Amino acid sequence: MMKTALITGATSGIGHATACEFAKHGINLVICGRRLDRLEIIQEKLQKLTNVHILNFDVRDKAATFKAIDSLPEAFKTIDILINNAGNAHGLDPINEGSLDDWDAMMDINVKGLLYVSKAIIPQMTERKSGHIINIGSSAGKEVYPKGNVYCGSKHAVLAITEGMRMDLNPYGIKVGAVNPGLVETEFSKVRFKGDEIADTVYKGYKALQAEDVAEVIYFVISRPNHVNIADVLMFCTAQASSTILNKSL
């Protein structure tokens, strides 16, 4: 029987690329996001390859998250694979100059949103004693960099939650892992720098990871045999050696 995957943050970047990659392999999709117009365009494109259902909600809204997932039609109710991808970064400021609104946005989406969606899906996985959860973290969850403070904190939390999930869900045979990319050329920087011109320079002078690169790794992780769980992946583009070392001559 073909599996069904629920992907948050599916309207752009890694989430969108993962939906496309999964569709190529015939995995049924529940694509989630805040931008209904984009969800509908993606659904129209991908339903030529597989079955696609859209859920339009904001992971920061606890009630809306549970209501949306509870509304899934019978054909999509059984979620075999959960990709917790929704996340963002706002600002790059020293802690003493940071915006409270930026901090709230990062913690609400990157941490609490991941928890809300997971809480809504995990009970069915424990009941079936099967399932696979992939949390999309970041190299920022492995290494703190200057002015990264709260964003790095949120991504360290994602990795801690992932490890805790893996321990707690091990008795049920549920796989849990994290994929942690470094610099990926997506809308990420435009959101972080609020459309500032700085965002346009982030990916200049080198070849950053593309969303499709990360999506291929995610598919590799979820397509391993039942006895194999890839618990943690850190991936960089060749030009990047760490959060602070980038060779723009490559």
Question: Can you say where each PLM-predicted feature lies in the sequence?
Answer:
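Conserved glycine-rich cofactor-binding loop
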Residues: 11-12
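Conserved glycine-rich Rossmann-like NAD(P)H-binding loop of the short-chain dehydrogenase/reductase
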Residues: 25-42
